[in-house]
Amino acid sequence: MLGSTAVMLLLLLPWTAQTRAVSGSSNPSWTQCQQLSQKLCTLAWSAHPSVGHVEPPREEADEETTDYVPHILCGDGCDPQGLKDNSQFCLQRIYQGLVFYQNLLGSDIFTGEPPLFPDGPVSQLHASLLGLSQLLQPEVHQWEPQIPSLSPNQPWQRLLLRIKILRSFQAFVAVAARVFGHGAATLTP
């Protein structure tokens, strides 16, 4: 089974420390963000590894290790009142998560053997992630988040990591899509 050290390396990505605030005082196009986030959500939820239905094993320290995976929490200002008062912190949190998952989808966990999907939806996920993150952070930035070199020894280990990452990604983009849906409905002039 994949060691807890490898899982911790995956989850300890410095996604919170290296990002900067979403630029500018103006908000993004909520309608464009809503459309892209809905597309991303659809792609993420239709993405299934080609291994059939596999339940990842539960790990004892699962709650501890998932603390480092991007989540949109109550204190992130993504609630209706928080978005109305100042949406920048929420948008920053969503941007950080998008960059985190974009880098994971480009890592050898998803590009290595065995192939994840027969038709290549990972490239569609990448394109949608890039489009949405550019709406939130249109300026070129100098930092590159680092992803630890995590190469599972066995193909089955890679498959389990993929399932775990996809589940976390699905939950993240579902909440982000709801945030952008609310923003498009209530914050668009």
From Swiss-Prot:
Keyword check for Transmembrane helix: no
Compartments, as annotated in UniProt: Secreted
One GO process term, biological-process aspect: defense response to Gram-negative bacterium
Swiss-Prot/TrEMBL keywords: Antiviral defense, Cytokine, Disulfide bond, Immunity, Inflammatory response, Innate immunity, Secreted, Signal, Tissue remodeling
Pfam family, one: IL23
A GO CC term assigned to this protein in UniProt: interleukin-23 complex
Superkingdom of the organism of origin: Eukaryota
Principal location listed in the UniProt entry: secreted
GO molecular function, one term: cytokine activity
InterPro entries: 4_helix_cytokine-like_core, IL-23_alpha
Signal peptide range in chain numbering: 1-19
Cited function: Associates with IL12B to form the pro-inflammatory cytokine IL-23 that plays different roles in innate and adaptive immunity. Released by antigen-presenting cells such as dendritic cells or macrophages, binds to a heterodimeric receptor complex composed of IL12RB1 and IL23R to activate JAK2 and TYK2 which then phosphorylate the receptor to form a docking site leading to the phosphorylation of STAT3 and STAT4. This process leads to activation of several pathways including p38 MAPK or NF-kappa-B and promotes the production of pro-inflammatory cytokines such as interleukin-17A/IL17A.
Recorded family membership: Belongs to the IL-6 superfamily.
Subunit note: Heterodimer with IL12B; disulfide-linked. The heterodimer is known as interleukin IL-23. Interacts with IL23R; this interaction enables recruitment of IL12RB1.
Name of this chain's protein: Interleukin-23 subunit alpha
Phylogenetic placement of the source organism: Eukaryota, Metazoa, Chordata, Craniata, Vertebrata
Gene of this entry: IL23A
